Amino acid sequence: MMQAESGSAEAKGPLPPPVGRKRRGLGILDFLLRLLAIGATLSAAITMGTTNETLQFFTQFFQFKARFYDLSAFIYFVIANAIVGGYLLLSLPISILNIVRPRAASSRVFLIFFDTVMVAVCTSGAAAAVAILYVARKGNSRTNWFAICQRFNSFCNQAIGAVSASFAGVVFLILLVLLSASTLYRRRP
């Protein structure tokens, strides 16, 4: 009786490894990284978009204002992070599709392409803002640009926080690209 059972098990062959669980886990990790990137990029855009400070000198009539929309690099930063955050929100259904159907390769190719584009957009926005913040903190004596962060401390600190959140979003996006690339590479025979 024992030989008959073992013979029938050999005829069926070995059971395939549970590949679906591993790919589903990668899909869940992809979804969580997207949520973190959404939080980072949208909080960066909102923080920079609400950054302003007013200083009063001598009387109420002399006021100096620092606002994000006075600098085109900060406007670009807000727009770039809003675009990336919007893309990430729109990519969530595709990420959910990768959890439900872990073998869907075409959606991975779509995500890896657009995630790479969003890395570039987010990095360029953050780099532009960092350049302005450097001049705001250090100044430039050759061009007579004075450091304003000693006076507008709250403005600069809020802008630095926004740029830090944006660079965190860049890191999450890079991790998403690497995750999608490794998933696609594992699909090859």
UniProtKB/Swiss-Prot annotation:
<feature type="transmembrane region" description="Helical">
    <location>
        <begin position="26"/>
        <end position="46"/>
    </location>
</feature>
<comment type="similarity">
    <text>Belongs to the Casparian strip membrane proteins (CASP) family.</text>
</comment>
<dbReference type="Pfam" id="PF04535">
    <property type="entry name" value="CASP_dom"/>
</dbReference>
<feature type="topological domain" description="Cytoplasmic">
    <location>
        <begin position="180"/>
        <end position="189"/>
    </location>
</feature>
<feature type="transmembrane region" description="Helical">
    <location>
        <begin position="159"/>
        <end position="179"/>
    </location>
</feature>
<comment type="function">
    <text>Regulates membrane-cell wall junctions and localized cell wall deposition. Required for establishment of the Casparian strip membrane domain (CSD) and the subsequent formation of Casparian strips, a cell wall modification of the root endodermis that determines an apoplastic barrier between the intraorganismal apoplasm and the extraorganismal apoplasm and prevents lateral diffusion.</text>
</comment>
<dbReference type="GO" id="GO:0005886">
    <property type="term" value="C:plasma membrane"/>
</dbReference>
<feature type="topological domain" description="Extracellular">
    <location>
        <begin position="47"/>
        <end position="73"/>
    </location>
</feature>
<keyword id="KW-0472">Membrane</keyword>
<feature type="transmembrane region" description="Helical">
    <location>
        <begin position="109"/>
        <end position="129"/>
    </location>
</feature>
<feature type="transmembrane region" description="Helical">
    <location>
        <begin position="74"/>
        <end position="94"/>
    </location>
</feature>
<feature type="topological domain" description="Cytoplasmic">
    <location>
        <begin position="1"/>
        <end position="25"/>
    </location>
</feature>
<comment type="subunit">
    <text>Homodimer and heterodimers.</text>
</comment>
<keyword id="KW-0812">Transmembrane</keyword>
<keyword id="KW-0325">Glycoprotein</keyword>
<feature type="glycosylation site" description="N-linked (GlcNAc...) asparagine">
    <location>
        <position position="52"/>
    </location>
</feature>
<dbReference type="GO" id="GO:0071555">
    <property type="term" value="P:cell wall organization"/>
</dbReference>
<feature type="topological domain" description="Cytoplasmic">
    <location>
        <begin position="95"/>
        <end position="108"/>
    </location>
</feature>
<keyword id="KW-1133">Transmembrane helix</keyword>
<dbReference type="InterPro" id="IPR006702">
    <property type="entry name" value="CASP_dom"/>
</dbReference>
<feature type="topological domain" description="Extracellular">
    <location>
        <begin position="130"/>
        <end position="158"/>
    </location>
</feature>
<keyword id="KW-0961">Cell wall biogenesis/degradation</keyword>
<dbReference type="InterPro" id="IPR006459">
    <property type="entry name" value="CASP/CASPL"/>
</dbReference>
<dbReference type="InterPro" id="IPR044173">
    <property type="entry name" value="CASPL"/>
</dbReference>
<protein>
    <recommendedName>
        <fullName>Casparian strip membrane protein 1</fullName>
    </recommendedName>
</protein>
<keyword id="KW-1003">Cell membrane</keyword>
